[in-house]
């Protein structure tokens, strides 16, 4: 994972690179990890309902000379916590849109 201000380059298992925009990041004290929500840039990522597919991964930030690393979500407890964060984010976005 290459980490820019608002973009990352994700490399899949086949070595293909995909530029993605970072939606937001957060840290979990409970799991001792950082997480990133992101989605592909410049591709038809919307489904038939006009919704964009958003991905989430744990990540280790890189330093000045090293790329960061995306990690898989490992447990159901992690997924439950991530779902809560996502639902809170979506609710806040809806409130902002209503204003």
Curated annotation (Swiss-Prot):
Transmembrane domains' residue ranges: none
The organism's place on the tree of life at top rank: Bacteria
Name the record gives this protein: UPF0473 protein GK2553
Pfam families (alphabetical): DUF1292
Family according to the record: Belongs to the UPF0473 family.
Record HAMAP family: UPF0473 (MF_01448)
Source species: Geobacillus kaustophilus (strain HTA426)
InterPro entries hit by this protein: UPF0473
